[in-house]
Protein backbone atom coordinates (compact mmCIF):
# COMPACT_ATOMS: atom_id res chain seq x y z
CA UNK A 1 0.00 0.00 0.00
CA UNK A 2 0.94 3.63 -0.43
CA UNK A 3 0.25 6.84 1.46
CA UNK A 4 0.36 10.56 0.75
CA UNK A 5 1.01 12.97 3.61
CA UNK A 6 -0.07 16.57 3.02
CA UNK A 7 2.90 18.42 4.47
CA UNK A 8 1.98 21.84 3.12
CA UNK A 9 3.90 25.05 3.48
CA UNK A 10 5.64 27.30 5.92
CA UNK A 11 4.15 26.34 9.28
CA UNK A 12 3.58 29.96 10.28
CA UNK A 13 1.18 29.03 13.10
CA UNK A 14 3.93 27.10 14.88
CA UNK A 15 6.66 29.71 14.68
CA UNK A 16 9.31 30.16 16.02
CA UNK A 17 9.85 26.37 15.97
CA UNK A 18 9.31 26.20 12.22
CA UNK A 19 12.02 28.77 11.64
CA UNK A 20 14.49 25.97 12.44
CA UNK A 21 12.73 22.92 10.99
CA UNK A 22 9.81 22.26 8.64
CA UNK A 23 6.68 21.71 10.72
CA UNK A 24 6.49 17.90 10.24
CA UNK A 25 10.01 17.63 11.70
CA UNK A 26 9.18 19.58 14.85
CA UNK A 27 9.37 17.22 17.83
CA UNK A 28 6.13 15.99 19.36
CA UNK A 29 6.47 13.61 22.33
CA UNK A 30 10.21 13.25 21.62
CA UNK A 31 10.05 12.39 17.92
CA UNK A 32 9.26 14.36 14.76
CA UNK A 33 5.50 14.76 14.26
CA UNK A 34 5.53 13.04 10.89
CA UNK A 35 7.35 10.00 12.27
CA UNK A 36 4.32 9.12 14.43
CA UNK A 37 2.30 8.83 11.21
CA UNK A 38 4.94 6.99 9.18
CA UNK A 39 5.46 4.36 11.90
CA UNK A 40 1.70 3.75 12.13
CA UNK A 41 1.44 3.42 8.34
CA UNK A 42 4.31 0.93 8.31
CA UNK A 43 2.45 -1.24 10.84
CA UNK A 44 -0.46 -1.80 8.41
CA UNK A 45 1.71 -2.66 5.43
CA UNK A 46 2.37 0.68 3.75
CA UNK A 47 5.63 0.40 1.81
CA UNK A 48 5.86 3.85 0.21
CA UNK A 49 5.07 7.28 1.64
CA UNK A 50 4.84 10.34 -0.60
CA UNK A 51 5.27 13.75 1.03
CA UNK A 52 3.29 16.49 -0.73
CA UNK A 53 5.39 19.54 0.01
CA UNK A 54 6.15 23.04 -1.22
CA UNK A 55 8.75 24.10 1.35
CA UNK A 56 12.31 22.83 1.88
CA UNK A 57 11.86 19.27 0.51
CA UNK A 58 15.62 18.61 0.69
CA UNK A 59 15.57 19.16 4.47
CA UNK A 60 12.72 16.68 4.86
CA UNK A 61 14.29 13.99 2.71
CA UNK A 62 17.76 14.31 4.24
CA UNK A 63 16.32 14.05 7.74
CA UNK A 64 14.05 11.10 6.95
CA UNK A 65 16.70 9.12 5.05
CA UNK A 66 17.83 7.37 8.24
CA UNK A 67 14.26 6.39 9.08
CA UNK A 68 13.77 4.97 5.58
CA UNK A 69 16.43 2.38 6.32
CA UNK A 70 15.33 1.69 9.91
CA UNK A 71 11.66 1.24 9.00
CA UNK A 72 12.18 -0.41 5.63
CA UNK A 73 9.87 2.07 3.92
CA UNK A 74 10.38 4.27 0.85
CA UNK A 75 9.89 8.02 1.39
CA UNK A 76 9.69 10.35 -1.60
CA UNK A 77 8.60 13.95 -2.20
CA UNK A 78 6.10 15.43 -4.60
CA UNK A 79 6.97 19.12 -4.76
CA UNK A 80 4.46 21.82 -5.67
CA UNK A 81 5.75 24.88 -7.51
CA UNK A 82 2.59 26.73 -6.44
CA UNK A 83 0.12 25.98 -3.63
CA UNK A 84 -2.39 23.39 -4.85
CA UNK A 85 -4.75 23.22 -1.87
CA UNK A 86 -5.59 19.84 -0.34
CA UNK A 87 -6.67 18.00 -3.52
CA UNK A 88 -4.27 19.33 -6.18
CA UNK A 89 -1.29 17.56 -4.58
CA UNK A 90 -3.03 14.20 -5.19
CA UNK A 91 -3.23 14.94 -8.91
CA UNK A 92 0.41 16.04 -8.92
CA UNK A 93 1.50 12.80 -7.21
CA UNK A 94 -0.76 10.56 -9.32
CA UNK A 95 2.10 8.62 -10.93
CA UNK A 96 3.59 7.89 -7.50
CA UNK A 97 0.27 6.71 -6.02
CA UNK A 98 -1.12 4.55 -8.85
CA UNK A 99 0.70 1.31 -9.55
CA UNK A 100 -1.99 -0.70 -11.36
CA UNK A 101 -2.84 -2.86 -8.35
CA UNK A 102 -6.14 -1.10 -7.67
CA UNK A 103 -5.22 -0.89 -3.98
CA UNK A 104 -6.56 2.08 -2.04
CA UNK A 105 -4.09 4.60 -0.65
CA UNK A 106 -4.00 6.70 2.52
CA UNK A 107 -4.06 10.49 2.59
CA UNK A 108 -3.17 12.25 5.87
CA UNK A 109 -2.89 15.82 7.08
CA UNK A 110 0.55 16.08 8.69
CA UNK A 111 -0.71 18.12 11.68
CA UNK A 112 -3.05 15.40 12.95
CA UNK A 113 -2.16 13.37 16.04
CA UNK A 114 -4.30 10.37 17.06
CA UNK A 115 -4.01 6.65 17.73
CA UNK A 116 -4.14 6.11 13.95
CA UNK A 117 -6.53 3.12 13.75
CA UNK A 118 -5.47 2.35 10.19
CA UNK A 119 -6.27 -1.38 10.36
CA UNK A 120 -9.89 -0.61 11.28
CA UNK A 121 -10.03 1.96 8.49
CA UNK A 122 -8.85 -0.57 5.89
CA UNK A 123 -11.38 -3.16 7.08
CA UNK A 124 -14.27 -0.66 6.98
CA UNK A 125 -13.26 0.69 3.58
CA UNK A 126 -13.20 -2.76 2.02
CA UNK A 127 -16.55 -3.69 3.61
CA UNK A 128 -18.67 -0.83 2.25
CA UNK A 129 -17.59 -0.98 -1.39
CA UNK A 130 -17.54 2.79 -1.82
CA UNK A 131 -14.93 4.97 -3.44
CA UNK A 132 -13.56 6.82 -0.42
CA UNK A 133 -13.55 6.67 3.37
CA UNK A 134 -12.88 9.61 5.67
CA UNK A 135 -12.33 9.42 9.39
CA UNK A 136 -14.44 11.77 11.48
CA UNK A 137 -14.12 12.84 15.10
CA UNK A 138 -16.73 14.10 17.54
CA UNK A 139 -16.41 17.67 18.83
CA UNK A 140 -18.20 19.61 21.56
CA UNK A 141 -18.79 22.75 19.50
CA UNK A 142 -19.60 21.69 15.93
CA UNK A 143 -20.70 25.22 14.95
CA UNK A 144 -17.00 26.16 14.64
CA UNK A 145 -16.33 23.55 11.96
CA UNK A 146 -17.55 21.96 8.77
CA UNK A 147 -19.83 19.16 9.97
CA UNK A 148 -20.09 15.74 8.28
CA UNK A 149 -23.71 14.53 8.16
CA UNK A 150 -23.75 10.73 7.85
CA UNK A 151 -25.99 7.70 8.25
CA UNK A 152 -25.27 6.26 11.67
CA UNK A 153 -25.64 2.60 10.69
CA UNK A 154 -23.88 2.42 7.31
CA UNK A 155 -21.55 5.41 7.67
CA UNK A 156 -22.59 6.77 4.27
CA UNK A 157 -21.93 10.51 4.08
CA UNK A 158 -25.02 12.49 3.11
CA UNK A 159 -23.65 16.03 3.04
CA UNK A 160 -21.29 18.58 4.54
CA UNK A 161 -22.52 21.66 6.40
CA UNK A 162 -20.04 24.49 6.98
CA UNK A 163 -20.27 26.05 10.47
CA UNK A 164 -23.95 25.20 11.01
CA UNK A 165 -26.08 27.66 12.96
CA UNK A 166 -28.50 24.88 13.96
CA UNK A 167 -27.40 21.45 15.15
CA UNK A 168 -27.01 18.94 12.31
CA UNK A 169 -24.40 16.68 13.92
CA UNK A 170 -21.19 16.73 15.94
CA UNK A 171 -18.74 14.94 13.65
CA UNK A 172 -16.01 16.72 11.70
CA UNK A 173 -13.40 15.68 9.17
CA UNK A 174 -10.35 14.29 11.02
CA UNK A 175 -7.90 14.65 8.11
CA UNK A 176 -7.35 10.90 7.63
CA UNK A 177 -8.61 9.28 4.39
CA UNK A 178 -8.47 6.00 2.48
CA UNK A 179 -9.19 6.49 -1.22
CA UNK A 180 -9.56 4.26 -4.25
CA UNK A 181 -7.38 5.23 -7.23
CA UNK A 182 -10.56 6.22 -9.10
CA UNK A 183 -10.81 9.29 -6.85
CA UNK A 184 -7.83 10.72 -8.74
CA UNK A 185 -9.98 10.86 -11.89
CA UNK A 186 -12.13 13.45 -10.11
CA UNK A 187 -9.21 15.80 -9.37
CA UNK A 188 -7.61 18.27 -11.78
CA UNK A 189 -4.05 19.55 -11.44
CA UNK A 190 -4.98 22.97 -10.08
CA UNK A 191 -5.60 24.51 -6.64
CA UNK A 192 -8.51 22.46 -5.30
CA UNK A 193 -9.99 21.64 -1.89
CA UNK A 194 -10.59 17.96 -1.25
CA UNK A 195 -12.91 18.82 1.63
CA UNK A 196 -15.08 21.41 -0.15
CA UNK A 197 -14.95 20.30 -3.79
CA UNK A 198 -14.00 16.63 -4.16
CA UNK A 199 -15.67 14.93 -1.20
CA UNK A 200 -19.10 16.59 -1.71
CA UNK A 201 -19.14 15.27 -5.30
CA UNK A 202 -18.28 11.75 -4.15
CA UNK A 203 -20.98 12.01 -1.45
CA UNK A 204 -23.57 13.08 -4.04
CA UNK A 205 -22.83 9.80 -5.86
CA UNK A 206 -23.37 7.88 -2.57
CA UNK A 207 -19.77 6.61 -2.68
CA UNK A 208 -18.31 8.43 0.33
CA UNK A 209 -18.32 6.79 3.76
CA UNK A 210 -17.18 7.93 7.20
CA UNK A 211 -15.76 6.03 10.15
CA UNK A 212 -15.84 7.57 13.62
CA UNK A 213 -12.31 7.84 14.99
CA UNK A 214 -11.93 6.03 18.33
CA UNK A 215 -9.75 7.59 20.98
CA UNK A 216 -8.26 11.06 20.91
CA UNK A 217 -7.67 13.46 18.02
CA UNK A 218 -5.93 16.83 17.78
CA UNK A 219 -4.62 19.13 15.07
CA UNK A 220 -1.36 20.26 16.67
CA UNK A 221 -0.50 22.94 14.14
CA UNK A 222 -0.47 25.77 16.69
CA UNK A 223 1.09 26.03 20.17
CA UNK A 224 -2.03 25.86 22.37
CA UNK A 225 -3.32 22.81 20.50
CA UNK A 226 0.17 21.29 20.58
CA UNK A 227 0.15 21.42 24.40
CA UNK A 228 -3.39 19.97 24.52
CA UNK A 229 -2.40 17.30 22.01
CA UNK A 230 0.55 16.26 24.19
CA UNK A 231 -1.80 15.76 27.14
CA UNK A 232 -4.15 13.62 25.04
CA UNK A 233 -1.26 11.64 23.57
CA UNK A 234 0.23 10.89 27.00
CA UNK A 235 -3.21 9.87 28.32
CA UNK A 236 -3.49 7.46 25.40
CA UNK A 237 0.05 6.19 25.96
CA UNK A 238 -0.81 5.35 29.57
CA UNK A 239 -3.66 3.13 28.37
CA UNK A 240 -1.68 1.49 25.56
CA UNK A 241 1.94 1.33 26.77
CA UNK A 242 2.39 2.35 30.40
CA UNK A 243 6.00 1.14 30.51
CA UNK A 244 7.07 3.98 28.19
CA UNK A 245 6.11 6.61 30.78
CA UNK A 246 8.43 7.79 33.54
CA UNK A 247 7.94 6.69 37.14
CA UNK A 248 9.35 7.80 40.48
CA UNK A 249 8.70 9.98 43.51
CA UNK A 250 9.44 13.12 41.48
CA UNK A 251 6.91 12.25 38.72
CA UNK A 252 3.31 13.52 38.80
CA UNK A 253 0.86 12.17 36.21
CA UNK A 254 1.92 11.33 32.67
CA UNK A 255 5.53 12.18 31.84
CA UNK A 256 7.71 11.05 28.93
CA UNK A 257 11.48 11.27 29.51
CA UNK A 258 14.07 10.25 26.93
CA UNK A 259 16.56 7.71 28.29
CA UNK A 260 19.50 10.06 27.63
CA UNK A 261 18.02 12.96 29.63
CA UNK A 262 19.39 13.68 33.12
CA UNK A 263 17.15 14.86 35.96
CA UNK A 264 18.55 16.21 39.24
CA UNK A 265 17.45 15.84 42.85
CA UNK A 266 14.32 17.36 44.34
CA UNK A 267 12.56 17.99 41.03
CA UNK A 268 8.80 17.79 40.48
CA UNK A 269 7.97 16.77 36.91
CA UNK A 270 4.44 16.58 35.54
CA UNK A 271 1.72 16.27 34.66
CA UNK A 272 1.81 16.21 30.86
CA UNK A 273 5.52 16.77 30.22
CA UNK A 274 7.86 15.50 27.49
CA UNK A 275 11.63 15.79 28.02
CA UNK A 276 13.75 15.11 24.94
CA UNK A 277 17.14 13.51 24.24
CA UNK A 278 20.24 14.97 25.87
CA UNK A 279 18.35 17.34 28.16
CA UNK A 280 19.79 18.33 31.54
CA UNK A 281 17.32 19.24 34.29
CA UNK A 282 19.15 20.42 37.40
CA UNK A 283 18.05 20.12 41.04
CA UNK A 284 14.75 21.53 42.27
CA UNK A 285 13.19 22.21 38.88
CA UNK A 286 9.40 22.23 38.47
CA UNK A 287 7.91 21.27 35.09
CA UNK A 288 4.24 20.89 34.15
CA UNK A 289 2.24 20.83 30.89
CA UNK A 290 5.27 21.54 28.72
CA UNK A 291 7.62 20.16 26.11
CA UNK A 292 11.39 20.37 26.58
CA UNK A 293 13.08 19.56 23.28
CA UNK A 294 16.41 17.94 22.51
CA UNK A 295 19.54 19.34 24.17
CA UNK A 296 17.83 21.81 26.53
CA UNK A 297 19.55 22.76 29.82
CA UNK A 298 17.27 23.84 32.69
CA UNK A 299 19.16 25.20 35.69
CA UNK A 300 18.38 24.89 39.40
CA UNK A 301 14.93 25.77 40.73
CA UNK A 302 13.53 26.98 37.40
CA UNK A 303 9.78 26.61 36.92
CA UNK A 304 8.17 25.98 33.51
CA UNK A 305 4.47 25.46 32.74
CA UNK A 306 2.22 25.61 29.66
CA UNK A 307 5.19 26.29 27.39
CA UNK A 308 7.42 24.85 24.67
CA UNK A 309 11.21 25.04 25.08
CA UNK A 310 12.98 24.77 21.71
CA UNK A 311 16.08 22.73 20.92
CA UNK A 312 19.35 23.50 22.73
CA UNK A 313 17.91 26.37 24.76
CA UNK A 314 18.99 27.26 28.30
CA UNK A 315 16.72 28.33 31.16
CA UNK A 316 18.51 30.08 34.04
CA UNK A 317 18.33 29.47 37.80
CA UNK A 318 15.05 30.47 39.44
CA UNK A 319 13.65 31.52 36.06
CA UNK A 320 9.90 31.18 35.61
CA UNK A 321 8.38 30.48 32.20
CA UNK A 322 4.62 30.14 31.81
CA UNK A 323 1.41 31.12 30.00
CA UNK A 324 2.20 29.67 26.55
CA UNK A 325 5.75 30.92 26.16
CA UNK A 326 7.36 29.45 23.04
CA UNK A 327 11.17 29.53 22.90
CA UNK A 328 12.76 28.95 19.51
CA UNK A 329 15.99 27.04 19.00
CA UNK A 330 19.04 28.08 21.06
CA UNK A 331 17.33 30.71 23.22
CA UNK A 332 19.00 31.64 26.51
CA UNK A 333 16.82 32.83 29.40
CA UNK A 334 18.75 34.49 32.21
CA UNK A 335 18.68 33.73 35.93
CA UNK A 336 15.52 34.86 37.76
CA UNK A 337 13.85 36.02 34.53
CA UNK A 338 10.04 35.75 34.29
CA UNK A 339 8.26 35.24 30.96
CA UNK A 340 4.47 35.59 30.93
CA UNK A 341 3.73 34.20 27.48
CA UNK A 342 4.92 35.19 24.05
CA UNK A 343 7.23 34.00 21.30
CA UNK A 344 11.03 34.21 21.32
CA UNK A 345 12.79 33.77 17.99
CA UNK A 346 15.85 31.48 17.68
CA UNK A 347 19.29 32.45 19.03
CA UNK A 348 18.05 35.20 21.35
CA UNK A 349 19.14 35.98 24.90
CA UNK A 350 16.48 37.09 27.38
CA UNK A 351 18.03 39.14 30.20
CA UNK A 352 14.93 40.91 31.54
CA UNK A 353 11.42 39.73 32.33
CA UNK A 354 8.59 39.63 29.78
CA UNK A 355 5.51 40.73 31.73
CA UNK A 356 2.94 40.33 28.98
CA UNK A 357 2.88 38.17 25.84
CA UNK A 358 4.99 39.62 23.04
CA UNK A 359 7.24 38.61 20.17
CA UNK A 360 10.97 38.88 20.89
CA UNK A 361 12.82 39.25 17.59
Swiss-Prot record:
One of its GO terms (molecular function) is GTP binding. Diphosphate binds at residues 9, 11-13, 23. InterPro entries: GMPPB_C, GMPPB_N, Hexapep_transf_CS, Mannose-1P_guanyltransferase, NTP_transferase_dom, Nucleotide-diphossugar_trans. Its EC number is 2.7.7.13. The keyword Nucleotide-binding applies. GDP-alpha-D-mannose binds at residues 6-7, 85, 109, 111, 146, 173. Pathway: Nucleotide-sugar biosynthesis; GDP-alpha-D-mannose biosynthesis; GDP-alpha-D-mannose from alpha-D-mannose 1-phosphate (GTP route): step 1/1. Keywords: GTP-binding, Nucleotide-binding, Nucleotidyltransferase, Transferase. GO terms for biological process: GDP-mannose biosynthetic process; protein glycosylation. CDD domains: M1P_guanylylT_B_like_N. SUPFAM superfamilies: Nucleotide-diphospho-sugar transferases. It catalyses: alpha-D-mannose 1-phosphate + GTP + H(+) = GDP-alpha-D-mannose + diphosphate. One of its GO terms (cellular component) is cytoplasm. Belongs to the transferase hexapeptide repeat family. Catalyzes a reaction of the Smirnoff-Wheeler pathway, the major route to ascorbate biosynthesis in plants. This is Probable mannose-1-phosphate guanylyltransferase 2. It comes from Oryza sativa subsp. japonica (Rice). The lineage of its organism: Eukaryota, Viridiplantae, Streptophyta, Embryophyta, Tracheophyta.
Amino acid sequence: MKALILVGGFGTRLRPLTLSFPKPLVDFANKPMILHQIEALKEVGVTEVVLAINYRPEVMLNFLKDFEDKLGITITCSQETEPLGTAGPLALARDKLVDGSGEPFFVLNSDVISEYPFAELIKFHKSHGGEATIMVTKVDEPSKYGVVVMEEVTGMVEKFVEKPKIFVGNKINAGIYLLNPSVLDRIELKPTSIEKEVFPRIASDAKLFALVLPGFWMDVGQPRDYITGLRLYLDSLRKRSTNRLATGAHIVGNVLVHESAKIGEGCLIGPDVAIGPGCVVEDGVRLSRCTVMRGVHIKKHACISNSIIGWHSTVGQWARIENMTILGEDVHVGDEVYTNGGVVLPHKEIKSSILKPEIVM
